[in-house]
């Protein structure tokens, strides 16, 4: 309850590196075209992802990843991610998307006003996760918080590879052997909070915020972030990012003492300039 009612302090908790806050509504779905990311076997890989909607971790698990560390400065993101994962574990393909469609359009966790989704998936939630969502529902019913204080229904489930039944069922199976560890952390601090090194890092468009323009202030922040990440990367590792504006020069602005190979793939069907890019450690 304290966490949920602490949202008004969000303005004091904006990170200095991006405009993200500790208590922002978390996306229900990704707004990236996840099909742009290369399909590779992630079995046995140490993986670090931004939490956000949870879809980067889910995509990694679909591709065989089982050891996922997930971080976000937004403390609501891990709860939204955990709820989606619990629902995937509980429901088959049709029932999952029927309930997600209800959540998205009706903005309620009481499906058809008869089924309390939180209670239905309780066995798949940790004690902390169940307590958060049951408290959220209590406060929402009593008009102390609003649905969109925590869940932002913006996004597009069709951009996820698990929107197809075959992929959904594979993801459901893979989740049985996967573990996600969540960290409440900004990108600049993540190297201080984890105790392992990674093969793959999926950052969504966080680096686009860090390197918002190619001016000295933003370039300095970007170099600090990449230098910090470099400390927790294994040889041959790859950082993946997403860019909605195609303004930032990710390769040109890396510190001279670091060696990374840059590559990118543009979205041909987005209607706007979007791309994924990779920084491969060499």
Roles of regions detected by a PLM:
Residues 261-282:
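Core SAM-dependent methyltransferase catalytic element
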Residues 3-8, 20-21, 76-176:
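Class I S-adenosyl-L-methionine-dependent methyltransferase module
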Residues 2-43:
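S-adenosyl-L-methionine
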Residues 236-243:
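Conserved beta-strand signature within the Rossmann-like core of class I S-adenosyl-L-methionine
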Residues 216-235:
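A short glycine-rich, Lys/Arg-flanked "PGG" loop and its adjoining helix->strand segment in the class I
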Residues 54-65:
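Conserved SAM-binding loop of SAM-dependent methyltransferases across substrates and taxa
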Residues 190-202:
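A short acidic, Gly/Pro-enriched loop at the edge of an enzyme's catalytic core
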Residues 44-52, 69:
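Conserved class I S-adenosyl-L-methionine
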């Amino acid at each position: 309850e304290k966490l949920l009612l602490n949202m008004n302090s969000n303005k004091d908790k904006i990170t200095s590196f991006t405009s993200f806050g500790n208590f922002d509504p978390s996306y229900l779905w990704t707004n990236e075209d996840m099909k742009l990311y290369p399909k590779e076997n992630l079995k046995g890989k140490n993986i670090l992802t931004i939490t956000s909607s949870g879809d980067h971790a889910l995509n990694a698990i679909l591709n065989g990843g089982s050891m996922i560390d997930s971080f976000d400065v937004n403390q609501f993101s891990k709860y939204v991610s955990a709820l989606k994962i619990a629902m995937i574990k509980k429901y088959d393909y049709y029932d999952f998307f029927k309930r997600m469609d209800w959540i998205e359009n009706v903005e309620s966790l009481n499906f058809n006003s008869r089924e309390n989704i939180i209670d239905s998936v309780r066995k798949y939630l940790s004690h902390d996760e169940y307590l958060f969502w049951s408290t959220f529902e209590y406060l929402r019913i009593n008009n102390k918080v609003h649905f969109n204080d925590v869940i932002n229904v913006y996004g597009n489930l069709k951009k996820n590879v698990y929107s197809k039944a075959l992929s959904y069922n594979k993801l459901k199976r893979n989740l049985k052997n996967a573990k996600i560890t969540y960290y409440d952390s900004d990108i600049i601090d993540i190297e201080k909070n984890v105790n392992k090194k990674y093969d793959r890092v999926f950052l969504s468009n966080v680096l686009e915020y860090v390197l918002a323009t190619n001016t000295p202030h933003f370039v300095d922040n970007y170099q600090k972030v990449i230098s910090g990440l470099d400390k927790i990367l294994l040889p041959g590792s790859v950082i993946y990012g997403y860019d909605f504006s195609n303004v930032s020069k990710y390769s040109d602005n890396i510190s001279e003492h670091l060696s990374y190979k840059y590559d990118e793939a543009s979205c041909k069907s987005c209607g706007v300039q979007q791309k994924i890019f990779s920084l491969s450690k060499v």
